[in-house]
C-alpha cells in the first residue's frame, strides 16, 4: 500500500471570539502519569463515504484542543529525561493529509500488520506534539483516521472522551455538556494521607530498582524519551504476528455459562474472555513445566476508587496481577482462571490506590532510585498483558458521516500483549488482537474456539 503524504501542519487551539485567550500554564505530572508507559500509542479508524471534509475535521480539532489543552501542549522533561509535566502553550497537534490510489476494502488490512504503520504519523524519533493525526483518503472515498497520543499525558479513558468530543466539535455541536474544560491534575489533587498508610507492597509491583543509569541529558520541552513504542518498524519483530480472534455474542454467552456454572453471579464478559485467552495462549505456547507461573498485567481504572472529579483528564490507572501455574491453567476448568482474574482485580481497590498515593508521595521512589515497571518488552512469555477497550466509547467518534466502519490498535508486535475491542459489527461480539509467535499461531487457532 503506497501512501502519498500531501501536507503536514500544526493545528492550534481555537477559542470563542468572546473569550480571552488563556494564559500559558504548567501542569505537573501526577504519580499516575509518571508510573505508566512513557510512549506513543496509535489507533486507526476507517469511515465509509460520503465522509466528512478535511476542513470540518480540522475545525473540530482546533475547537476540541481549545477545551482539552493538555493535548495541545508539550511534554516537559527533567535533566535525566524524567517526565515533569505538560506546558499548556497552545503548540498544537500535528495534522497530516495523505491519499492512497486504491480502495480501502481492497488494500487496508483487517488486523494490525506493518502496513498499518503508514496510516498514522511516525512514532519514531523526537515528537514535539502530544497528539498527531493523519487523514488518509482512499480512491473509493473512504477515510482512514490515524491518531497518536503520548500515553504519559492521558490514558485510554481520557483519550476516548477527547475523541468523542472531537467528533461533536466537527459536527458543530458543543464539545461537552458543560462549557468548563475537563479537570486535570494539580498539586493538591492526589494528596497523601496524614499520617501516610502504605498498606501494600509497591516495590516490585509498580516500581523496580533499575541498574545504574547512563549519563543524563539536558532537560527539554517536547520530544519523546526512552522506550517509546515497540512496534518493530516495517518488519515483524522476532517472527511475531498479530492474530485477530473474533468472539461472537453467542460464543461469549456459552463461554460465560461454562465459566460461571455453580456461581451465583456470573463472571463478567472481560473476565471470561481473558481467562479463555490466557488458557489458550498457555496451551499454544507449549509451556511444559506445570509448576511454571504465568502472570497477567491488567489495567485498573482508579477514577471511582479515588472519587476523581467527573471527566478527569489524565492517567488514573494501576494494575492487577493475577498469577497461576501452567498446571492449574491447563488442568483445572475455565472457572479457576476466571476466579483468579476476578480476585486480583478486586484486590486493586480504593485502599490499594490510596496506599500507592502514599508510597509515591513518600520520597521512597526518588530516594531509592526506583523506576516504573511499565516498560515495553518484545516478548512477555510466559506472561500476558491486556488492554481492554470494551467499555470505552471509541466507536462513538462521528465527524458527521456516521460512526466508523472499523477501529483497531496500530501494529505493536509485543508477544503476549492483548487488546480486547468491541467488534465494529455492534452486535455484542468482541475482537481480540493477540500477538503470537508465528510457530505458535496454528496451535492458538486450533483451541481458540473450543469450550471445554
Swiss-Prot record:
**Induction line:** By wounding.
Q: What does the record give as EC number?
A: 2.3.1.-
Listed Gene3D superfamilies: Chloramphenicol acetyltransferase-like domain
Where along the chain is composition biased (Basic and acidic residues)? 222-234
Spell out the molecular function terms from Gene Ontology: acyltransferase activity, transferring groups other than amino-acyl groups; hydroxycinnamoyltransferase activity
Q: Which UniProt keywords apply?
A: Acyltransferase, Transferase
Q: What residues form the catalytic site here?
A: 151, 398
Q: In which tissues is this gene expressed?
A: Highly expressed in roots. Expressed at low levels in flowers.
Q: What class of enzyme is it?
A: transferase
Show the coiled coil region(s): none
Q: What is the protein's known function?
A: Hydroxycinnamoyl transferase that catalyzes the transfer of an acyl from p-coumaryol-CoA to putrescine, to produce coumaroyl putrescine. Can use feruloyl-CoA, caffeoyl-CoA and sinapoyl-CoA as acyl donors. Seems to be able to transfer the acyl group from feruloyl-CoA to the acyl acceptors agmatine and spermidine.
Q: What is this protein called?
A: Putrescine hydroxycinnamoyltransferase
Species for this entry: Oryza sativa subsp. japonica
Q: What is the lineage of its organism?
A: Eukaryota, Viridiplantae, Streptophyta, Embryophyta, Tracheophyta
Amino acid at each position: 500500500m503506497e501512501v502519498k503524504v500531501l501536507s503536514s501542519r500544526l493545528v492550534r487551539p481555537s477559542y470563542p471570539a468572546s473569550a480571552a485567550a488563556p494564559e500559558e500554564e504548567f501542569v505537573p505530572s501526577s504519580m499516575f502519569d509518571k508510573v505508566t508507559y512513557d510512549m506513543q500509542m496509535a489507533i486507526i479508524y476507517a469511515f465509509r463515504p460520503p465522509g466528512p471534509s478535511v476542513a470540518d475535521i480540522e475545525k473540530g480539532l482546533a475547537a476540541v484542543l481549545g477545551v482539552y489543552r493538555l493535548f495541545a501542549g508539550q511534554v516537559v522533561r527533567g535533566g535525566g529525561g524524567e517526565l515533569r509535566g505538560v506546558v499548556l502553550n497552545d503548540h498544537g497537534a500535528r495534522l497530516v493529509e495523505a491519499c492512497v490510489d486504491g480502495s480501502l476494502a481492497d488494500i487496508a488490512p483487517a488486523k494490525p500488520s506493518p502496513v498499518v504503520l503508514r496510516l498514522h504519523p511516525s512514532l519514531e524519533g523526537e515528537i514535539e506534539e502530544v497528539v498527531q493525526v493523519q487523514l488518509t483518503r482512499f480512491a473509493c472515498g473512504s477515510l482512514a483516521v490515524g491518531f497518536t497520543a503520548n500515553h504519559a499525558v492521558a490514558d485510554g479513558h481520557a483519550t476516548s472522551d477527547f475523541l468523542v468530543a472531537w467528533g461533536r466539535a466537527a459536527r458543530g455541536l458543543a464539545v461537552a455538556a458543560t462549557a468548563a474544560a475537563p479537570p486535570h491534575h494539580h498539586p493538591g489533587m492526589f494528596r497523601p494521607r496524614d499520617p501516610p498508610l502504605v498498606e501494600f507492597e509497591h516495590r516490585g509491583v509498580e516500581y523496580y530498582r533499575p541498574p545504574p543509569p547512563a549519563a543524563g541529558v539536558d532537560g527539554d520541552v517536547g520530544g519523546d524519551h526512552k522506550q517509546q513504542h515497540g512496534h518493530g518498524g516495517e518488519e515483524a519483530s522476532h517472527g511475531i504476528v498479530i492474530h485477530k480472534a473474533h468472539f461472537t455474542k453467542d460464543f461469549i454467552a456459552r463461554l460465560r455459562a461454562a465459566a460461571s456454572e455453580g456461581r451465583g453471579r456470573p463472571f463478567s464478559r472481560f473476565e471470561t474472555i481473558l481467562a479463555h485467552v490466557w488458557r489458550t495462549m498457555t496451551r499454544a505456547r507449549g509451556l511444559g513445566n506445570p509448576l511454571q507461573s504465568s502472570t497477567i498485567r491488567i489495567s485498573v481504572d482508579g477514577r471511582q476508587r479515588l472519587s476523581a472529579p467527573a471527566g478527569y483528564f489524565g492517567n488514573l490507572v494501576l494494575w492487577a496481577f493475577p498469577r497461576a501455574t501452567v498446571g492449574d491453567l491447563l488442568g483445572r476448568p475455565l472457572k479457576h482462571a476466571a476466579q483468579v482474574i476476578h480476585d486480583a482485580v478486586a484486590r486493586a481497590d480504593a485502599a490499594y490506590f490510596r496506599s500507592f498515593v502514599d508510597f509515591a508521595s513518600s520520597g521512597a521512589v526518588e530516594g531509592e532510585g526506583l523506576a516504573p515497571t511499565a516498560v515495553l518488552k518484545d516478548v512477555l512469555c510466559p506472561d500476558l498483558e491486556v488492554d481492554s477497550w470494551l467499555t470505552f466509547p471509541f466507536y462513538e467518534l462521528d465527524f458527521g458521516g456516521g460512526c466508523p466502519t472499523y477501529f483497531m490498535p496500530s501494529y505493536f508486535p509485543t508477544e503476549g500483549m492483548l487488546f480486547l475491542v468491541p467488534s465494529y459489527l455492534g452486535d455484542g461480539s468482541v475482537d481480540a488482537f493477540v500477538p503470537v509467535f508465528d510457530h505458535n499461531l496454528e496451535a492458538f487457532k486450533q483451541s481458540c474456539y473450543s469450550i471445554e
